[in-house]
């Protein structure tokens, strides 16, 4: 039996994360559109169902990859409200968990979120993606570097998730 992780969002980034980790982990996937990567083990359209299922699994790592859109506002700034909404929902659920944001966000955003969610059990870590939309799955599977930013011990837990799947890639 494999350890499991959860992936929120199944667009080209979330679908790539799902496919890229599927040989190493069971994947609990959530997307409100109902479209999922064929590599997902369990699929949910409701975040609360995803969390309930994930948290009840004996081998769940406590890691949620958040791969959601951050569209550009007219001001040129990223609109992080979709990501923040999901993080807020995750913070309202009991237990210790790590949210790994793969979305484009401005510098300092994870620090702001970690302050906001302090004491809830949720820690936010950033893991930028280096994917091209046309080859996203292959780009994810063939990474030449992995960058993780965030407080310990959460960033260490994310590092272990990547090390298991990509043991030869520098982190």
Label each region the model flagged.
Residues 65-69, 102-103, 149:
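Short, well-ordered coil/turn residues at beta-beta hairpins
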Residues 71-136:
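Rossmann-like NAD(P)(H) cofactor-binding subdomain of soluble oxidoreductases
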Residues 53-54, 112-125, 136-171:
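Internal alpha-helical scaffold of NAD(P)-dependent oxidoreductase catalytic cores
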Residues 62-63, 98:
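Structural motif
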Residues 1-54, 59:
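NAD(P)+-binding Rossmann beta1-loop-alpha1 motif at the extreme N-terminus of oxidoreductases
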Residues 59-60, 143:
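Alpha-helix C-terminal capping/helix-to-coil transition sites in glycosyltransferase folds
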Residues 34-39, 107-109, 153-157:
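Short, charged/polar "capping" segments at the starts of alpha-helices
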Residues 6, 28, 98-100, 123, ...:
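A structural signal for isolated positions on well-ordered beta-strands in alpha/beta enzyme cores
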